[in-house]
Regions:
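A generic structural signal for solvent-exposed, polar alpha-helical segments
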Residues: 21-24, 56, 63, 197
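Transmembrane helix-loop junctions and nearby membrane-interface residues
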Residues: 34, 38-44, 51, 70-73, ...
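An amphipathic alpha-helical interaction surface
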Residues: 2-9, 91-224
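Membrane-embedded hydrophobic alpha-helical segments
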Residues: 2-51
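Terminal, low-complexity, charged helical segments
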Residues: 12-19, 28, 66-79, 104-105, ...
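Amphipathic, membrane-active segments
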Residues: 45-87
């Protein structure tokens, strides 16, 4: 009986001990604050990922739309002759707000500031390709990353080929050469083969994205 009374007295003393309650409340407050902070960090990370995925998706969708709009012309069977329309096709593939800064580069290749803008846009596309593979999940991420990479490479090969065409014209004027002679003089056939290979790559990449409904799968991943 005495032992029970002592226990009760101890309990009463604890209830009267303001330091104990202050410590307990402080501890609980710290735990609650930590939990809220972790929840806020998690929500912030999800929001950041959502924004990155959305921005990336919109840029990719723009590339897909440009290719789709010009698909028939880009995939037409090529004759065994120089591709003199490469500058026009370059303009088709850069005809949106994301790529418009690079479009002028094909008119006067290697001349600044257009050349520098084109280099910057190439780096942005490379970054977009890498980012897409990192922030999206599954095979769709790899598939769309390859499409972006092939898109960038096609623009680069078109740019190189336009430089070659300009050199070929200069060669023809300087040496009063025929078209065939000018082609051989600047090794046009080899450069054309590389460009045609880039056309084939983007065609296959676009087919893979379309056939596997990659854009729809990426869209489903854009959520908080």
């Amino acid at each position: 009986m005495i032992r029970v009374l002592n226990i009760n007295e101890n309990i009463l003393e604890i209830f009267k001990d303001w330091n104990f309650w202050l410590s307990l409340i402080t501890g609980l407050t710290a735990v609650i604050a930590l939990v809220l902070t972790l929840m806020q960090i998690r929500l912030s990370n999800k929001q950041s990922l959502f924004e990155r995925r959305l921005e990336c998706y919109l840029k990719i969708d723009g590339l897909m739309q440009l290719y789709k709009e010009n698909q028939k012309l880009l995939e037409t069977e090529r004759k065994d002759e120089p591709l003199f329309a490469v500058d026009l096709e370059f303009l088709w593939l850069t005809n949106n707000t994301y790529l418009e800064e690079a479009s002028e580069a094909i008119k006067k290749p290697l001349e600044n500031p257009e050349h520098k803008k084109f280099l910057v846009k190439r780096e942005e596309l490379k970054k977009l390709s890498a980012e897409a593979e990192l922030i999206f999940k599954g095979r769709s991420a790899k598939t769309i990353s390859c499409f972006i990479s092939d898109y960038e490479q096609l623009l680069f090969k078109m740019y190189q080929y336009q430089i070659l065409l300009n050199n070929m014209r200069n060669y023809s004027e300087q040496f009063k050469a025929t078209l065939e002679m000018a082609q051989k003089g600047v090794n046009e056939t080899a450069y054309r083969e590389k460009l045609l290979h880039a056309y084939a790559n983007i065609k296959m990449a676009y087919l893979q994205v379309s056939k596997n409904h990659v854009m729809e799968k990426l869209k489903k991943q854009i959520k908080l």
